[in-house]
């Protein structure tokens, strides 16, 4: 995967090499400017795949020959690439953490060529998985405690998107996936029921249901909308349950609907099942669902226990791009002095926050809720024993004094001097951590529409550095 990079990263690398600055230490931040779907926060994901990439980063003989064939790279540079390994430092916010615009999700400190060459894959994996985890979390929250499964692999935009997309959705809160390989590789619980083809294969719907119940008596969820949900599907399901499962003493089963007015049909189906004594039968639905459809159906009294969500989750259809960027924020002199750098733009939102930084999350001691994120220069420490005044970096007259709080650093070391120093927790723990961290956000921040803006503020020192660089750049 080393060659999964933008070509300019290689030409710039060759240029750095020729200019004699290949070993110049640089600092890059990965951050995003806008939460997808107008939401209040995003979910960080993709770190484990980034770690795997960094650990296996090297150029093969075939890669070197290809680059030589382009006649754009010096032999000295190609010789350098032949022995290439990542030797720098990487800090990152752990997967599953709610994150906000402008704060660094990943910080890379490395020689210029190394830092440049990992840009594309870093953005690819963090952007994609953070996008899907964020969308999944919205959908799971809309379901109000009901089970949500990821059903999207056949609509994903490529095999990798299906496999790691299911992983990201699991971090965001889904209970499992229909994608078998995601279970095999990442441990995302895989499951499923039947397709309409199963029902069509048999002489009639009842025979299809009876055979399935006989084959999978402890996992019998029947797809009831192949012909007519209320006139044949549900009655035939009840008959199969009565004739196959009931004699076995099995009371847990399910039906699934994949079409029609799901709010109306599930209410009718629930009554039919309850009247027949199948009160423990679960009702599942699918059919191009998203958080808004789920919300609306529940408001309309839909009787649904499980949602299977496919294309609108695995592609994040409503806003299918997570706009993470990778920007130089500092360079380091041979004596260790860090020189902050800034990117200026006519678009104010594109002006970067310079320097090697820390990100603190401030929590109220009395509520346990997140109050604000506070970005500082790397050598600053937050003293939680003293009141802290924070301010909006764009409207500095907006100020708030925080007291009785705890401060937790979000960025943790992943690689130091090229050596991995971080152990990825099991995916189930990442999922649980995500749910716990989302719980620390106020409900106002979690609104789907017009959420309360969460504070992400700069320390006085960092703000002054940014302003100084802005003024200097305009002289």
Q: Locations of the language-model features?
A:
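Gly/Ser/Thr/Ala-enriched C-terminal appendages of enzymes
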Residues: 1-24, 28, 33, 38-39, ...
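Buried, small/hydrophobic-residue-enriched core segments of structured protein domains
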Residues: 1-27, 34-36, 72-73, 78-87, ...
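N-terminal, Lys/Arg-enriched amphipathic/low-complexity engagement segments
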Residues: 24-82
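Short coil/turn segments at secondary-structure boundaries
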Residues: 65-66, 134-138, 152, 446-453
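Short histidine-centered loop motifs in beta-beta connectors
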Residues: 90-98, 469, 474
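Hydrophobic residues within beta-strands of alpha/beta enzymes
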Residues: 191, 255, 283, 305-307
């Amino acid at each position: 995967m080393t060659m999964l990079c933008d070509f300019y990263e290689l030409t710039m690398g060759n240029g750095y090499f020729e200019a004699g600055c290949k070993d110049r230490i640089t600092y890059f931040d990965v951050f995003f400017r806008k939460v997808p779907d107008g939401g209040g926060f995003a979910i960080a994901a993709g770190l484990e795949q980034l770690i795997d990439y960094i650990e296996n980063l090297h150029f093969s003989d075939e890669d070197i020959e290809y680059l030589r064939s382009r006649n754009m790279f010096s032999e000295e540079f190609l010789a350098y690439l032949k022995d290439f390994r990542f030797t720098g430092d990487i800090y990152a916010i752990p997967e599953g953490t709610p994150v906000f615009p402008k704060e660094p999700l990943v910080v890379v400190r490395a020689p210029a060529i190394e830092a440049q060459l990992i840009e594309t894959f870093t953005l690819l994996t963090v952007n994609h998985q953070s996008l899907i985890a964020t969308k999944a979390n919205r959908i799971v929250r809309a379901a109000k405690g009901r089970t949500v499964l990821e059903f999207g692999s056949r609509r994903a935009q490529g095999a990798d998107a299906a496999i790691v997309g299911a992983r990201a959705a699991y971090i965001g809160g889904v209970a499992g996936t229909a994608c078998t390989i995601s279970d095999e590789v990442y441990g995302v619980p895989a499951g499923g029921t039947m397709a309409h083809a199963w029902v069509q294969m048999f002489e009639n719907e009842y025979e299809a249901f009876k055979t399935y119940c006989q084959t999978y008596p402890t996992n019998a969820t029947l797809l009831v909308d192949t012909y007519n949900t209320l006139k044949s599907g549900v009655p035939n399901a009840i008959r199969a349950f009565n004739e196959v499962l009931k004699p076995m003493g099995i009371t847990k089963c399910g039906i699934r609907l994949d079409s029609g007015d799901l709010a109306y049909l599930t209410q009718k189906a629930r009554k039919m099942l309850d009247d027949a004594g199948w009160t423990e039968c679960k009702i599942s639905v699918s059919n191009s669902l998203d958080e808004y459809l789920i919300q609306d159906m529940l408001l309309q009294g839909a009787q649904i226990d499980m949602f299977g969500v496919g294309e609108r989750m695995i592609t994040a259809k409503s806003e299918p791009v997570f706009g993470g960027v990778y920007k130089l924020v500092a360079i380091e002199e041979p004596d260790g002095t860090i020189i902050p750098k800034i990117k200026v733009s006519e678009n104010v939102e594109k002006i970067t926050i310079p320097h090697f930084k820390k990100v603190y999350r401030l929590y109220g001691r009395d509520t346990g809720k997140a109050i604000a994120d506070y970005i500082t220069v790397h050598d600053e420490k937050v003293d939680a024993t003293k009141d802290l005044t924070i301010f909006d970096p764009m409207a500095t007259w907006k100020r708030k004094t925080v007291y009785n709080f705890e401060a937790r650093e979000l960025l943790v070391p992943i690689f130091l001097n090229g050596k991995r120093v971080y152990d990825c927790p099991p995916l189930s723990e990442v999922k649980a951590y995500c749910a716990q961290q989302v719980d620390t956000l106020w409900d106002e921040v979690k609104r789907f529409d017009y959420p309360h803006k969460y504070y992400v503020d700069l320390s006085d020192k960092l703000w002054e550095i940014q302003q100084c660089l802005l003024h200097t750049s305009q002289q």
